[in-house]
């Protein structure tokens, strides 16, 4: 009898992707975060769908509709906080996933890596427009400040900002279109995820040793499905603890005040997962320069395959680059902390030093350390 999963036209695709997929036998728990990101995406789409059933994208009722969800809808408070904290878990998994890719040299699979960068940017755009929807003070002023950055683009800047706003300020038209974007973008992310997997399965997964693992592969199921399920349970446990015990720990108290265009909050800042990029933006006094630095802080990830001059794959046998890598991670944490601080001394100076360090490590220090390690191998 023919095995259905191996012959059915649809099940065959699933089988080659999740069941009989040849996988390196030594991939560690750092490889779990891809499946965790998929889980986060499903959670976000489902909770978002139920929130959209009760939310109204109108400036007069948006804030009260979110309050109505939390007070009057059955388990509305749970759905809302799962969605808000699910976004934080999403970005934690995303940062770890990218960090693992850098550490173990997964960027040599350049198509997969570049689709990953597009996914990262799309996820950031989705989170930004989503943060505007509750129409609290930080939602309104965050939208105003960040969209206004586009006015730094020469010639077309002002026109572009008014086009995005749908008027001369952030108002009803802006909120409506942001809701439309926030609804459609997760499905675009899901589509790009399939492309990401398609490219990954063309080459096969990387592994911690950085060596060719073609001679030692095992089927994805049951070994890695079980391993992924454990990761998913731990993720759900962390998400439920965060949601049920500390629902507002990652939010901003200002967002519990309805949006008021006449009253500016003392410190306008985005969600925690954007703070590193926000700190880089603020560290440059020139508006256009700041915007370029902000964009480059993400796009610079695309230079990893181009600047890779190492004879070894990954950092596991490269102590000098390993040290630089962990300095880079520490620097990112410093940038995140600075992004949440007011614009005053000494924070501005620390932010500028950390921003320069961020770019210098990727463009200068890592290629130099690679060259040094290549020469050490020859000795």
Curated annotation (Swiss-Prot):
- Name the residues that bind a ubiquinone: 201
Q: Cofactor note, please? A: Binds 2 heme b groups non-covalently.
The residues that cross the membrane are 33-53, 77-98, 113-133, 178-198, 226-246, 288-308, 320-340, 347-367
- Give a GO molecular function annotation for the protein: metal ion binding
Query: Tell me, which GO biological process terms does this entry list?
Result: mitochondrial electron transport, ubiquinol to cytochrome c
Major localization listed first in the record, in broad terms: mitochondrion
Task: Return the similarity comment.
Answer: Belongs to the cytochrome b family.
Protein name in the entry: Cytochrome b
Its lineage opens with: Eukaryota, Metazoa, Chordata, Craniata, Vertebrata
């Amino acid at each position: 009898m023919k095995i259905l999963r191996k012959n059915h036209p649809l099940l065959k695709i699933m089988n080659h992707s999740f069941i009989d997929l040849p996988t390196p036998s030594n991939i560690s728990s750092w490889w779990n975060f891809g499946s965790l990101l998929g889980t986060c995406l499903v959670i976000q789409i489902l909770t978002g769908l139920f929130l959209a059933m009760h939310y109204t994208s109108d400036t007069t009722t948006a804030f009260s509709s979110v309050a109505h969800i939390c007070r009057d809808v059955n388990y509305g408070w749970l759905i809302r906080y799962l969605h808000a904290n699910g976004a934080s878990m999403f970005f934690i998994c995303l940062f770890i996933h990218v960090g693992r890719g850098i550490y173990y040299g997964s960027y040599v699979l350049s198509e997969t890596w570049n689709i990953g960068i597009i996914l990262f940017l799309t996820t950031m755009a989705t989170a930004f427009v989503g943060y505007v929807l509750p129409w609290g003070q930080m939602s309104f002023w965050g939208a105003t400040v960040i969209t206004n950055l586009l006015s730094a683009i020469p010639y077309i800047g002002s026109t572009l900002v008014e086009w995005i706003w749908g008027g001369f300020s952030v108002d009803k038209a802006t909120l409506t279109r942001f809701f439309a974007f926030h609804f459609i973008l997760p499905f675009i992310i899901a589509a790009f995820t399939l492309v990401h997997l398609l490219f990954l399965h063309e080459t096969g997964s990387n592994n911690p040793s950085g060596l060719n693992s073609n001679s030692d592969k095992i089927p994805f199921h049951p070994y890695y499905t079980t391993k992924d399920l454990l990761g998913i349970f731990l993720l759900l446990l962390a998400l439920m603890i965060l949601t049920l015990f500390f629902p507002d720990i990652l939010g901003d108290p200002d967002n519990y005040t309805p949006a008021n265009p006449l009253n500016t909050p003392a410190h306008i800042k985005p969600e925690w997962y954007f703070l590193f990029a926000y700190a880089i933006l603020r560290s440059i006094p020139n508006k256009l320069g700041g915007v370029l630095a902000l964009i480059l802080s993400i796009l610079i990830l695309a230079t990893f395959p181009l600047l890779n001059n190492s004879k070894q794959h990954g950092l596991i046998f490269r102590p000098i680059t390993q040290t630089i890598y962990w300095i880079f991670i520490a620097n990112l944490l410093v940038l995140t902390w600075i992004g949440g601080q007011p614009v005053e001394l000494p924070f501005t100076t620390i932010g500028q030093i950390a921003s320069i360090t961020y770019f210098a490590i990727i463009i200068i220090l890592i290629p130099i350390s690679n060259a040094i390690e290549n020469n050490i191998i020859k000795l």
